[in-house]
């Protein structure tokens, strides 16, 4: 059954995901975050190793919400860079250094410092 589910997902859901991904990258404002998860019995990795689920979504101002998840085995910045290739708007993210390749985000560090000082 798992194999059937994978085949159906690749054939029928992947094209939908790709269209949503294209539309997402055209939006002027996005949010991104990543969180850890543990995948049991993943080939080539121990059951205690950390994997990451990356989340990308439109802002609350968007007429239609688009929320996409992407599994990655690591937290390398290249994953966000590859996923958001072609995106040229504002990206709201936490202080993770992997997002700093965006031109807009140097202001993020200043904002975070301001918030820390204010507290």
Please identify what each model-predicted range represents.
Residues 1-119:
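Catalytic center-proximal scaffold of phosphoryl-transfer enzymes
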């Amino acid at each position: 059954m798992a194999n059937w589910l994978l085949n159906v997902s690749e054939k029928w859901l992947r094209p939908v995901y790709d269209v949503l991904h294209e539309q997402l990258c055209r939006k002027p404002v996005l949010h991104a975050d990543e969180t850890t998860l543990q995948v049991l019995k993943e080939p080539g990795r121990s059951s205690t190793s950390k994997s990451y689920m990356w989340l990308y979504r439109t802002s609350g101002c968007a007429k239609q919400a688009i929320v996409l998840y992407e599994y990655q085995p690591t937290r390398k910045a290249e994953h966000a860079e590859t996923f958001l290739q072609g995106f040229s708007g504002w990206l709201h993210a936490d202080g993770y250094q992997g997002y700093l390749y965006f031109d807009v985000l140097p202001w993020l560090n200043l904002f975070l410092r301001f918030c820390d000082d204010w507290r």
